[in-house]
């Protein structure tokens, strides 16, 4: 009887070791859960960014307004007949 109890105790300790301490135990599970959460957050950010870029591409394909806006803001272009005024604020 003592042998069986001892054997069961050793078996219980071995299973507890695998659960808590081994590389495939709860520590690894927590690390994987953190990694998955971080990856999901990163994926959501990238999906949002892709939607913005897709809308911008669609706007550039379909209309001249976005193209004109980019030319004005990025290249400093003005329309014919317009006068450009630059306001400089004093420090």
Swiss-Prot record:
Give the UniProt record's GO annotations in the biological process aspect: FtsZ-dependent cytokinesis
| Record localization | Cell inner membrane
The primary site where this protein sits is membrane
Q: Which residues form a coiled coil?
A: 26-74
Q: Which GO terms describe its cellular component?
A: cell division site; cell septum; plasma membrane
Q: Which residues lie on this side of the membrane: Cytoplasmic?
A: 1-3
What the entry lists under Pfam families is as follows: DivIC (PF04977)
Membrane disposition: Single-pass type II membrane protein
Q: Where are the transmembrane segments?
A: 4-21
Keywords linked to the UniProt accession = Cell cycle, Cell division, Cell inner membrane, Cell membrane, Coiled coil, Membrane, Transmembrane, Transmembrane helix
InterPro entries for this protein: Cell_div_FtsB (IPR023081), FtsL/DivIC (IPR007060)
Q: Which stretches of this protein does UniProt put in the Periplasmic compartment?
A: 22-91
PANTHER family assigned: CELL DIVISION PROTEIN FTSB (PTHR37485:SF1)
Instruction: Tell me how this protein assembles.
Output: Part of a complex composed of FtsB, FtsL and FtsQ.
Query: What function is annotated for this protein?
Result: Essential cell division protein. May link together the upstream cell division proteins, which are predominantly cytoplasmic, with the downstream cell division proteins, which are predominantly periplasmic.
The UniProt similarity line reads: Belongs to the FtsB family.
**Protein known as:** Cell division protein FtsB
Q: Which organism was this protein described from?
A: Nitrosococcus oceani (strain ATCC 19707 / BCRC 17464 / JCM 30415 / NCIMB 11848 / C-107)
């Amino acid at each position: 009887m003592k042998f069986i109890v001892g054997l069961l105790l050793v078996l219980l300790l071995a299973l507890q070791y695998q659960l808590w301490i081994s590389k495939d135990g709860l520590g690894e599970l927590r690390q994987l859960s953190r990694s998955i959460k971080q990856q999901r957050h990163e994926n959501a950010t990238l999906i949002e960014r892709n939607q913005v870029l897709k809308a911008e591409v669609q706007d550039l394909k379909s209309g001249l307004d976005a193209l004109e806006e980019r030319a004005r803001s990025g290249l400093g272009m003005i329309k014919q007949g317009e006068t450009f005024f630059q306001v400089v604020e004093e420090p």
